[in-house]
Amino acid sequence: MRLVVYLSSLALAVAAGAQATTARGTLMGTVMRGPITPVCAIEQPCDEPAPNVTLLFTRNGTVVGRAVTGQNGRYRVRLPAGAYAVRRPSATTIDKRLAPNRVWVAAARTRRIDFSIDTGIR
């Protein structure tokens, strides 16, 4: 009988630990790129939404999640809670200037994180 109680307690503890480590959160926002012209004017914005941009969310060098922006530059991704580095795959040197390049995902929360890609146009 003690063995059954012990094994049941152990199974509950393992299940509780597994649930805690898989808590997920959501990031959403818009990726903008710019400047898109050397001189910005009121009639012409300096930045524009960046469609079809892939964002890689990595932890300890391993890709944990990815998101691709829509035509309006918006993205949404669910990830396990924790800290992530963010980068673009095989982007040109200019397009690698992604900011911010580190984010934090909170368990059971949705956070808005907007990214910008510096085109280097000056």
Each model region followed by its residue ranges:
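Short, acidic Ser/Thr/Gly-rich low-complexity loop/linker segments typical of extracellular
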Residues: 59-72
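Beta-strand-rich domain onsets/edges
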Residues: 10, 14-26, 30-36
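Structured interaction patches on ligand/partner-binding surfaces of diverse proteins
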Residues: 91-120
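A short, solvent-exposed beta-strand micro-motif common in secreted/extracellular proteins
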Residues: 82-93
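Glycine-centered loop-to-beta-strand initiation motif
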Residues: 29, 69-77, 115
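Surface-exposed loops/turns
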Residues: 71, 80-81, 107
